[in-house]
Amino acid sequence: MEYSSYHVNVPQWREITVGSHLPAELRRFAEMAHNLWWTWNEDAKSLYSGLNPELWEEAEQNPVLFLERMDYEELEALTHDGNFMRKMENVYSTFKAYLDVEPDHSRPSVAYFSMEYGLDRVLKIYSGGLGILAGDYLKEASDSNVDLCAVGLLYRYGYFDQALAMDGQQQVHYDPQNFGQLPIEKVMQPDGRQLVIHVPYADSFTVHANVWKANVGRVSLYLLDTDNELNSEFDRPITHHLYGGDWENRLKQEILLGIGGMMTLKVLGIEKDVYHCNEGHAALINIQRLCDYISEGLDFGQAMELVRASSLYTVHTPVPAGHDYFDEGLFNKYMKGYPDKLGITWDELMNLGRQTPGNKGERFCMSVFACKTSQAVNGVSKLHKSVSQQMFAPLWKGYFPEENHVGYVTNGVHFPTWCTAEWKKLFKDNFDENFMNDQSNQEIWKGVYNIPDEEIWNMRKRLKTKLISYIKWKCGRDWLKSQVDPALGVSIFEKFNPNALLVGFGRRFATYKRAHLLFTDLDRLARIVNNQEPVSYTPLTPAD
């Protein structure tokens, strides 16, 4: 074989993907692992966990990583285990029957944009309630046959992992995600390469984002990732951390989500009836939508009417401090080319993000822009509707707050995700067979009176015992890593009262979360914390 001097002296780099090899009979096993449907199907989860419970926990209940870490001989042996193969075929049949249901085309199709999604702990692209709601939204849309796709960002480090030292101080760890070990897949082009979206940032440079897809039942979630060699060292970290970096990086993230997200759907040939912006982070989808309509020959006014008529904005934050504001200089640095594309002036663009048009001292607010470009705006509870109407009242001068078009849809949860296997079985045994598809039906819920009180109370006690066991295991593991005196840990666990009321404050302990409400009635607070039936209270604090 002959080599030219060029090939001898210059490295020839090739990208390869390394993956685990499964016996052909278990390909269906891997297929289910790559669809997050397993996160809310108890039979699917037990199929994985039952094989090797210890390895399942070591793999952090991630079926993709779990299969990768299993020995090939162990996997090969499964193919000769008739009992396991029958179970797998039964679960797979349920899975395929679920996927084969056609979307309900009598309802509007939806494109959903959010900065975070709380789908499962194995996919660290969420930090709090906003993400959990978004994740449940996708799961419920899948269960309800809604024709929906979603767009978000794929973070290399996600949000932080929390551990507690013996002195109660929070320890923060950012561990990188190995995308090849997650239940996601690359979106491929016809030439066999991963799809890359080229997003213009100002006139001077372009950011290149790899496109991935997470299958959430019947819903496709497209995720953008900038941590690749096409980008400079300054742009690769755009998707390193959720809500990480300074305000400039936050703006870069929101440009990627909004403008880059819309570009992604266009490349994939996806068009929907409604474009849903989950919080103001994704508001720039409407900049790109305006540009697309204008490029087709419409003027700005016509394009705005079409965009507004098909846009929905959900606001979650109850106070102005929780919204994103960008200084005009920073906003101009990255958006200065858009007035020409839109056929408007720079001041007109800025005014779209100002409560008071013409106020030069006012920064560009993503939430204000979302309100002005969306026909439908909703809060997340009846009370939050009233709060939001007051908060956005300056946008509609001459109207009483209660007259503006901010409505509400009360937050809910995806029942199959948050209900334990034990409760699911209890409901299945005692409720109407239509319960899972009609969970808010009060007539069905009347069946709860047929369940003996002792059965319900004993169920709660058993589940609480499991919770306490988990808390001890989790704290013990963290303390072991911190080289804490074991005797001190044991003494704390011995004081743990299983009969005490446990209150988990499931939100970040940021100031605008209004934790000070605990101290509005000090006498009542004193009675609660000093009562012989105590309360355990543990909030989650932000990394900063």
Regions inferred by a protein language model and the residue ranges of each:
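Catalytic cores of carbohydrate-active enzymes across secretory and cytosolic contexts
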Residues: M1-L540
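Extracytoplasmic Gram-positive cell-surface binding/anchoring modules and repeats
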Residues: D544
